Amino acid sequence: SEMCIRDRNMTIQEAQKIIDNWIKEKGVRYFNELTNTTILMEEVGELARIVSRKYGEQSFKEGEKDLDLADEIADVMWVLICIANQTGVDLTEALKKNIDKKNSRDSRRHLDNKKLR
């Protein structure tokens, strides 16, 4: 199933299951929640470095030009999914609820924000 996943779309639920299986088969076990949260911050930092170099005012250092934005985003997602898995969060349901919340609570917030005009 690892090879065929590249040939089709993948749901969030499938990603959670694939990562859970990988952790159990190849990763021995999940790191604890605190360790994974720290790893998440590290991965977000790596993503931030690329964004600041590519879109911000900083320039790339020697050897950084081949850094891959998509791969760093995927690293963030991987660790986030690990945290969701180990804490029993169904990300599909959580995201649906979050979108509903934004649609009800924040539906006019940005449209009415004069700073964005």
What do the PLM-derived regions correspond to, one by one?
Residues 1-5:
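Short, small-residue-biased leader/transition segments that mark boundaries at the very start
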Residues 9-73, 77-117:
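Flexible "arm" and connector segments at domain edges
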